[in-house]
Amino acid sequence: MEDAAIREGFDHLRPGSDYDKLYDAAVCRAGADWLIGINATRLFSVLYGVTLNVGRVMSPTLALLVQRESDIESFISKPFYVPEITCGGFTASGEKMTERSEAEKIRMDCDHNSAFVRSVEKQVKTIQPPRLYDLTTLQRECNRIYGYTAQQTLDYVQSLYEKKLATYPRTDSQYLTKDMQATAASLILWLRDNMTFGKGYAGEPDIDRVTDDSKVTDHHAIIPTVEIARTDLSELPSGERDVLTLLVVRLLCATTQVHRFEAVTAILDCQGYTFTAKGKTILQSGWKEVERIHRMSIRQSETEHKENEAVALPVLQEGQTFEAVSASLREGKTSPPKHYTEDTLLSAMETAGAEDMPEDAERKGLGTPATRAATLEKLVSAGFVPRKKKQLIPTTTGRNLIAVLPDNIKSPILTAEWESMLKQVEHGELSATSFMDQIADMSRTLVCLLYTSPSPRDRSV
């Protein structure tokens, strides 16, 4: 925190009693997690004769992985065919088709015949810079780029925080507060002038873009600190250096110019068939130039950063004709959903069940930025989800556990319902005792219903 922010806080201290209800809600959340977890874990472990860890966050997270694996296994790949014509140094594509004979007929009709440009549409588009990092987005990026687990990233950024090289890491905000603007601006100018990635920085820092007091609750976004100017980064462990580098790159990207390009869509006609060609011309690299320099510095494959962008098209005019075009057939197969990685699973955890939560819920999704890494590690250590390179694939035990768990335990809707009631506790609309009584009733009902049902103990998990 900046000195001004600390003084501001002390000048406007509020009585601790103002936060009693917030405290009650936090105690209820922890108590409910413990009560359901300890009873459900013991219950299913006894029923199936093997230790089965069950939890409000862990079980729905495992269910996401199991559902994805089921979707992959049940997916039936189907072939598709796309007729294409090449003319004037560029390629235009027709509609994707499922019948080869139809696509082949179009290819034969068009091959060595003429085509003309029916229309050309040009549109200038802008891609805004990315937001600053909160913990989850930092963990996702580190997994995608470096292959670090969520826990490794948390450990690295925690160490940077303790070395005063990064701000507090356990945050869910991607913005700074107004009192940080002056310090952030001077830090950005130093990074621009002294870091390799600064060569791609254009214009003056736009701090307003990353400043919003209303979107900062407990802690602001994670950024490097001015201590970086007095530190030999080569002496840092490689993991910490990688994470700090990402913080630097993101701060520069978030505050420099937008990326602007002209998108061109050309519609061509060949023998009555419609073909589309798309291209783009960069007008202003903006923040993507900083990102490009960083990508080059870590020798990351350009193919990992394809943005479905076509190369620039030649200048085309409506009515322009191309003689004797070359027609071909592009073949492919539909692809199944991809296995979860920690990057994509963290994203899924952020949004799971969010639509069922109240608009003003403090926590949405499964877990919090500070606990999601620990949840993944528990799933791995419990033998439910081993890591296979970057992929997270549930074991047979994990899949069988989800198969026997009641829907309310493995669904994120339970979290949504709890957060709704906890918000009532926080506002004084529901007593902490009433909330915990409901959780206790739920726990008793779960145990009585399953333990007294026809014995599943002959079944294996």
Give, region by region, the residue ranges found by the protein language model.
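Toprim catalytic domain recognition across nucleic-acid enzymes
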Residues: M1-G353, M357-F384, K389-L392, T396-N400, ...
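Conserved small/polar residues in nucleotide/adenosyl-binding loops
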Residues: Y451-D458
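Leucine-rich, amphipathic alpha-helical/linker segments
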Residues: I207, T211-K215, P412-V447
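Post-transcriptional modification and biogenesis factors for structured RNAs
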Residues: V461
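Hydrophobic alpha-helical segments
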Residues: A254, A352-E355, A382, N408-S411, ...
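Short, amphipathic alpha-helical interaction segments positioned at domain boundaries
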Residues: W190-M195, R399-L422
